[in-house]
């Protein structure tokens, strides 16, 4: 634990937060989202508030002497190659007072001045903070959306599976290890997704939105060769192409396209009017494929980093 007091604020750097602290952080994130229109801390970041996580540190900024939590940042140093990654948020009613910069400076120090920072939604205040901290833009993550309701439903192609491939839904308690292996193979080039652990999977399976009937597995010869995990955002009435993956040896035969169609048909069958997904802007083949499937860019998350 590291304490840093400066003027009317204090920043605590913790390896683990208590359940009460976690509730306070989630409340702060939700209040900021109502103003910003988007969560400043990702799903993974919110899940990492539960108990101690290797390589994860929490920065809690409180105003003194009240002790009110008005800022939060999370630093994850688990990538063996890339610099530590961070997300941060300041309560809307307490912005413009240097809290964001104070969190950013602390993140730089804690990361050894090797840092990547997400700016979800690419808000102007986040871009300004990145500039103040001397960070440069290096990654753009697009959120793309498409309609699902009639007549758009008719545009979802009929799935055509490669020879020998069958599709079924995920069986909790049976498929975890096999899916993790398939996920690691499919995303060997993508450490954020490919490094998911059993704990990460179980965290998501414990969420209210988890539905095995929307988690599709493609098998050939008893082995998982591809998958499409969908997610329903009930409050927003939004269906998500949460993750689509195909093992390298099964790529190139249209399996990913067919799995995407299966998931979209499932989401449309749930009566959801819109589907969304995330894709890196520089993944031109994927952006093109999703564009042909009716997706258009809705908003963009930006990642900044220190010069390397």
UniProtKB/Swiss-Prot annotation:
- Enzyme Commission no: 2.3.1.189
Q: Which InterPro entries match?
A: Acyl_CoA_acyltransferase (IPR016181), Bact_Acetyltransf (IPR050832), GNAT_dom (IPR000182), Mycothiol_AcTrfase (IPR017813)
Which residue ranges does the record assign to the N-acetyltransferase domain?
A: 12-149, 165-308
Per UniProt, acetyl-CoA 2 binds at 244-246, 251-257
Q: Which GO terms describe its molecular function?
A: mycothiol synthase activity
* Pfam families, per the entry: Acetyltransf_1 (PF00583), Acetyltransf_7 (PF13508)
Q: Where does 1D-myo-inositol 2-(L-cysteinylamino)-2-deoxy-alpha-D-glucopyranoside bind?
A: 43, 192, 231, 240, 278
EC class, as a word, reads: transferase
Q: Which UniProt keywords apply?
A: Acyltransferase, Repeat, Transferase
Q: Which reaction does it catalyse?
A: 1D-myo-inositol 2-(L-cysteinylamino)-2-deoxy-alpha-D-glucopyranoside + acetyl-CoA = mycothiol + CoA + H(+)
Annotated GO biological processes are:
mycothiol biosynthetic process
Q: Where does acetyl-CoA 1 bind?
A: 88-90
Q: How does it assemble?
A: Monomer.
**Role this protein plays:** Catalyzes the transfer of acetyl from acetyl-CoA to desacetylmycothiol (Cys-GlcN-Ins) to form mycothiol.
Q: Which family does it belong to?
A: Belongs to the acetyltransferase family. MshD subfamily.
Q: Could you tell me what this protein is called?
A: Mycothiol acetyltransferase
Q: Which gene encodes it?
A: mshD
């Amino acid at each position: 634990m590291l304490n840093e007091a400066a003027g009317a604020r204090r920043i605590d750097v913790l390896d683990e937060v208590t359940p009460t602290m976690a509730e306070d952080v989630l409340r702060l994130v939700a209040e900021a989202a109502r103003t910003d229109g988007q969560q400043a801390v990702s799903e993974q970041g919110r899940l990492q508030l539960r108990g101690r996580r290797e390589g994860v540190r929490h920065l809690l900024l409180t105003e003194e002497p009240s002790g009110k939590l008005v800022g939060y940042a999370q630093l994850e140093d688990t990538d063996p190659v890339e610099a530590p990654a961070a997300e941060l948020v300041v309560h809307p009613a307490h912005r413009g007072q240097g809290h964001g910069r104070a969190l950013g400076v602390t993140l730089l120090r804690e990361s050894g001045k090797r840092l990547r920072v997400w700016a979800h939604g690419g808000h102007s205040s986040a871009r300004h903070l990145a500039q103040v901290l001397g960070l440069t833009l290096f990654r753009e993550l697009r959120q793309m959306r498409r309609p699902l309701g009639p007549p758009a439903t008719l545009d979802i192609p009929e799935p055509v599976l490669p020879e020998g491939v069958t599709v079924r839904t995920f069986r909790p308690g049976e498929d975890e290890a096999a899916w993790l292996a398939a996920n690691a193979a499919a995303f060997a080039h993508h450490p954020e997704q490919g490094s998911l652990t059993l704990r990460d999977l179980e965290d998501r399976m414990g969420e209210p939105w988890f539905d095995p009937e929307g988690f599709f597995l493609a098998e050939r010869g008893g082995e998982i060769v591809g998958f499409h995990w969908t997610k329903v955002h009930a409050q927003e009435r939004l269906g998500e192409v949460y993750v689509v993956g195909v093992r390298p040896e099964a790529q190139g035969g249209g399996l990913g396209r067919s799995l995407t169609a299966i998931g979209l048909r499932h989401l449309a069958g749930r009566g959801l009017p819109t589907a969304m997904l995330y894709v890196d802007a520089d993944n031109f083949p994927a952006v093109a494929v999703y564009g042909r499937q009716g997706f258009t860019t809705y908003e963009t998350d930006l990642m900044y980093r220190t010069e390397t």
